[in-house]
UniProtKB/Swiss-Prot annotation:
<keyword id="KW-0521">NADP</keyword>
<feature type="binding site">
    <location>
        <position position="107"/>
    </location>
    <ligand>
        <name>sn-glycerol 3-phosphate</name>
    </ligand>
</feature>
<dbReference type="InterPro" id="IPR008927">
    <property type="entry name" value="6-PGluconate_DH-like_C_sf"/>
</dbReference>
<dbReference type="GO" id="GO:0051287">
    <property type="term" value="F:NAD binding"/>
</dbReference>
<keyword id="KW-0444">Lipid biosynthesis</keyword>
<dbReference type="GO" id="GO:0005975">
    <property type="term" value="P:carbohydrate metabolic process"/>
</dbReference>
<dbReference type="Pfam" id="PF07479">
    <property type="entry name" value="NAD_Gly3P_dh_C"/>
</dbReference>
<dbReference type="InterPro" id="IPR013328">
    <property type="entry name" value="6PGD_dom2"/>
</dbReference>
<comment type="similarity">
    <text>Belongs to the NAD-dependent glycerol-3-phosphate dehydrogenase family.</text>
</comment>
<comment type="pathway">
    <text>Membrane lipid metabolism; glycerophospholipid metabolism.</text>
</comment>
<keyword id="KW-0963">Cytoplasm</keyword>
<dbReference type="GO" id="GO:0008654">
    <property type="term" value="P:phospholipid biosynthetic process"/>
</dbReference>
<dbReference type="Pfam" id="PF01210">
    <property type="entry name" value="NAD_Gly3P_dh_N"/>
</dbReference>
<feature type="active site" description="Proton acceptor">
    <location>
        <position position="193"/>
    </location>
</feature>
<feature type="binding site">
    <location>
        <position position="256"/>
    </location>
    <ligand>
        <name>sn-glycerol 3-phosphate</name>
    </ligand>
</feature>
<feature type="binding site">
    <location>
        <position position="257"/>
    </location>
    <ligand>
        <name>NADPH</name>
    </ligand>
</feature>
<feature type="binding site">
    <location>
        <position position="258"/>
    </location>
    <ligand>
        <name>sn-glycerol 3-phosphate</name>
    </ligand>
</feature>
Length: 335
């Protein structure tokens, strides 16, 4: 393979994906916002800020210039936080040629517009560029992927040929990629699982046990599915890696930033203090508000999401939120 690849965003996930591709001997340029981080990675071959202890492949190069990262590339992997993605895409737009395959690896819903990342891309980029959009998602902690622990994810695109190209690009003996054409479902699954992970963390922080966590995961999946279906997603997507798979991992794994936020809230910390301790973005904090507003706009019932929003943004006590969920009107189980 002789593809030239740019990766936009040098957090833990962006660095991991860039390193995965560079380990295959591909020509990969990783863009970081912080100039000092670029210099450190060049000098030490380690991203000590976001992925400490992982040696970066010799084939991986680093830049603080979006022009250098994006110009002339065959694939551009987008790993900027979802709330700044629009601004990054606006800067990239004049640099991108038709035919470049865009791979979104960020998980969130834009707060101001309630758009998913594919919708943001379509709004900002010329149609001849945006048509090659894809999304890479699934249960994949960056550190485990970096350590080459077996991982399976999904590459989704409305164009099956684009999805297949992304599948071929990223697949390694330890990183298995499936294809899908349900971009909406994969994006909603990736975004909403972070909100439910905050809820699971709150439950763990309160010491409520495994029964509670299992209920939150199951009913959280129902909320994700209902919202996705209202937006045109396919129901089977939510039973797959980008739905149930990512949800289970993020709600149970100790490496989950969103679960960690919830756990500390459940233990009594204030949100500002929790976020002040974190170097990396917990997408579920902003996505909780986006999803809550999207549910109200679409008329989709999402009680767990509503309570997470209230705990995060209206200072509702965590234990009160749990009790309000448990004392809702009785009803039949439904999706």
């Amino acid at each position: 393979m002789s593809e030239r690849i740019g990766v936009i965003g040098a957090g833990s996930w962006g660095t991991t994906l860039a390193n995965l591709l560079a380990r295959k001997g591909l020509d990969v340029t990783l863009w970081a916002y912080e100039a000092e981080l670029v210099e450190e990675m060049r000098a030490t071959r380690v991203n000590s800020l976001f992925l400490p202890g992982i040696e970066l492949a010799p084939a991986l190069s680093f830049t603080n210039s979006l022009e250098e990262a994006a110009t002339g590339k065959d694939f551009l992997v987008l790993v900027s936080p979802s709330q700044v993605m629009r601004g990054v895409l606006a800067q990239l737009a004049p640099l991108l040629r038709p035919g470049v395959v865009l791979v979104n690896a960020s998980k969130g819903i834009e707060l101001d517009t309630l758009m998913t990342m594919d919708q943001v891309c379509a709004a900002v980029l010329p149609p001849e560029v945006a048509r090659c959009f894809s999304v890479l998602s699934g249960p994949s902690f960056a550190r485990e992927v970096s350590l080459e622990m077996p991982t399976a994810v999904v590459a989704a695109s409305g164009d099956p040929a684009v999805a297949a190209a992304v599948q071929r690009l990223f697949t390694t003996p330890s990183f298995r990629v499936y294809t899908n054409t349900d971009v909406v479902g994969v994006e909603i699954g990736g975004a909403l699982k972070n909100v439910i992970a905050v809820a699971a963390g709150i439950s763990d922080g309160l010491g409520l046990g495994h029964n509670t966590r299992a209920a939150l995961i199951t009913r959280g999946l129902a909320e994700m599915t209902r919202l996705g279906l209202s937006m045109g997603a396919q129901p089977e997507t939510f039973a797959g890696l980008a739905g149930m798979g990512d949800l289970v991992l993020t709600c149970t794994g100790d490496l989950s930033r969103n679960r960690t936020v919830g756990m500390k809230l459940g233990q009594g910390m204030k949100l500002a203090d929790v976020l002040g301790e974190m170097r990396m973005v917990a997408e579920g904090v902003k996505t909780a508000e986006s999803a809550y507003r999207l549910a109200r706009r679409t008329g989709v019932e999402m009680p767990i999401t509503e309570k997470v929003y209230q705990v995060l943004h209206e200072d509702k006590p965590a234990r009160q939120a749990v009790m309000e969920l448990m004392t809702r009107d009785l009803k039949a189980e439904r999706w």
